[in-house]
């Protein structure tokens, strides 16, 4: 591109000049150069300025640079003296930092520095080291001090960018694997077959919803952690020396981490379900069950009555089984009456409540374990309880007419099942056993509940197929990621152990039946 008429240029094509390296990170010296071409460019403010294509003598053509007029000087005696002065300052600076070889890697730098006579170098070295930055290059752009600060900023910015790119690359290359047990892999295959081939749907709302599953797992986890707590001092004396804190709890036995994990699963599930966890055949059902027309708000008077009845019940909630109980039999006269909230409610209003609030059933189970009940009642209870809740019921005996839900000290014969809770405060134990994933007033009565209140284990299991991809886009330290994956592994083992309870084949129904189950409005609880 040729220079336009009307603009004056101080230099012309083919002229020999002295030029600064345009890159501020390079050595601040003047190089012998030659102008190859002249064009009209624009500065940062959009104004037209002349630009010169500079070829540095002795440099490869790849180092040719476009330079503004302020970086170019005429080849005069005065500018030659400035060139030698800057070269001497560069020598002194490089000697002071001890990085001469690394600083003078570019072609042309050595030739400029060697052009200074040896005697002149020796004579002025001491003055060069002690001279100020304004003396060294006050003629151009503020001096060496300003140049050095600018260079430090550029390097820091470049280093930060490199670290960011490296971190992003490591995240892209990091492979996260979640091992799903074989029985659950088969469940995923069956789930796909039922939905896509047989055109069946999971009946919603599920009798055992995700909130129930996650809450039950935390209590299951806490009980197992408590049982192993008293074994750790006997079998792991070396751990006391490794961890000076006597209250150290491994990540895989930390109840607080377990609570955080299940809460994270709940939040992730509610967000990702409509995005990646539903088959196309299920989209219509999802829109129907999440519609505000599908749910009815509960009256405050009913909620207040139920709460007052819960406060009168002496038995604390130990577990949340989601199995319906018979309402024909009544508790004995000597026992306090437990709330019977479902007796007067139509079946349509009970389905969602079974899956979200079920401490009443636990109270009845606790009383039946210590008080004589009719034979038919005991058989019905045992037959209707899932194996998970029967298993935990054996581990959590409760004495009727007693405010303490569990024995806090082991028996003399050593058969107390809660020896692991030895030395712990009763309120800590009750807090774990009565812990709830979400508060009682959630969700608000005027809003439909989130998917975790409606869907069950079938859709929760699908989340673990997508979790590696989701976690790969999050920033985790290796330590935190390892602990999280360990808790995922324990939770999947829990689902596999009670597979028959959480994944019944009867959960899949024909589309017409699934549509009928969502035809009438349901109550939010």
UniProtKB/Swiss-Prot annotation:
SUPFAM superfamilies xref list: Chromo domain-like (SSF54160)
Summary of the knockout phenotype: Mice with a conditional deletion in male germline do not show any phenotype: spermatogenesis is not affected.
Span of domain MRG: 172-521
Superkingdom field: Eukaryota
Region (Required for the histone acetyltransferase activity of the MSL complex): 294-444
Cellular compartments per GO CC: MSL complex; nucleus
Sites of Phosphothreonine modification: 409
Record localization: Nucleus
Matching InterPro entries: Chromo-like_dom_sf (IPR016197), Chromo/chromo_shadow_dom (IPR000953), MRG (IPR008676), MRG_C_sf (IPR038217), MRG_dom (IPR026541), MSL3_chromo-like (IPR053820)
CDD domains according to UniProt: CBD_MSL3_like
Pfam families: MRG, MSL3_chromo-like
Official protein name in the record: MSL complex subunit 3
Protein's organism: Mus musculus
């Amino acid at each position: 591109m040729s220079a336009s008429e009307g603009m004056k240029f101080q230099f012309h094509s083919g002229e020999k000049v002295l030029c600064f390296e345009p890159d501020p990170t390079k050595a601040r010296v003047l190089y012998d150069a030659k102008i190859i071409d002249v064009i009209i460019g624009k500065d940062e403010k959009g104004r037209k300025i002349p630009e010169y294509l500079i070829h540095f003598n002795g440099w490869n053509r790849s180092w040719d640079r476009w330079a503004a007029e302020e970086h170019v000087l005429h080849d005069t005696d005065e500018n030659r003296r400035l060139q030698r002065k800057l070269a001497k300052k560069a020598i002194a600076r490089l000697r002071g930092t001890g990085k001469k070889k690394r600083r003078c890697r570019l072609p042309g730098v050595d030739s400029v520095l060697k052009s200074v006579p040896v005697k002149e170098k020796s004579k002025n070295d001491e003055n060069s080291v002690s001279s100020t930055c304004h003396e060294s290059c006050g003629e151009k752009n503020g001096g060496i001090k300003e140049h050095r600060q600018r260079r430090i900023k550029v390097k820091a910015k470049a280093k930060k960018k490199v670290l960011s790119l490296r971190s992003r690359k490591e995240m892209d290359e990091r492979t996260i694997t979640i091992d799903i047990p074989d029985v659950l892999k088969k469940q995923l295959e069956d789930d796909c077959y039922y939905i896509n081939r047989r055109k069946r749907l999971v009946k919603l709302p599920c009798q055992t919803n995700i909130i129930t599953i996650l809450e039950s797992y935390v209590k299951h986890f806490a009980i197992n952690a408590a049982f192993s707590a008293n074994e750790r001092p006997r079998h792991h004396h070396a751990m006391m020396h490794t961890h000076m804190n006597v209250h150290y709890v491994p990540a895989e036995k930390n109840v607080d981490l377990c609570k955080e994990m299940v809460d994270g699963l709940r939040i992730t599930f509610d967000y990702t379900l409509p995005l990646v966890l539903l088959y196309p055949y299920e989209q219509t059902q999802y829109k129907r069950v999440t519609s505000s027309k599908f749910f009815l708000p509960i009256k405050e008077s009913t909620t207040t009555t139920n709460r007052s009845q819960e406060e009168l019940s002496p038995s604390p909630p130990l577990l949340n089984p989601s199995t319906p109980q018979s309402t024909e039999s009544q508790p004995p006269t000597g026992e306090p009456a437990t709330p019977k909230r479902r007796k007067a409610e139509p079946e349509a209003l009970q389905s969602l409540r079974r899956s979200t609030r079920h401490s009443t059933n636990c109270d009845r189970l606790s009383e039946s374990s210590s008080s004589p009940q009719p034979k038919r009642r005991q058989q019905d209870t045992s037959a209707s309880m899932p194996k998970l809740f029967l298993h935990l019921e054996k581990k959590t005996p409760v004495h009727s007419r007693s405010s303490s839900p569990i024995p806090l000290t082991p028996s003399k014969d050593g058969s107390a099942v809660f020896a692991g809770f030895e030395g712990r405060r009763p309120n800590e134990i009750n807090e774990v056993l009565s812990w709830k994933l979400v508060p009682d007033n959630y969700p608000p009565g005027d809003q439909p509940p989130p998917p975790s209140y409606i869907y069950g284990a079938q859709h929760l299991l699908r989340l673990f197929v997508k979790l590696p991809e989701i976690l790969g886009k999050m920033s985790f330290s290796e330590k935190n990621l390892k602990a999280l994956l360990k808790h995922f592994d324990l939770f999947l083992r829990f689902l596999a152990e009670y597979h028959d309870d959480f994944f019944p084949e009867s959960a899949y129904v024909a589309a017409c039946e699934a549509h009928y189950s969502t035809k009438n409005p349901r109550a939010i609880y």
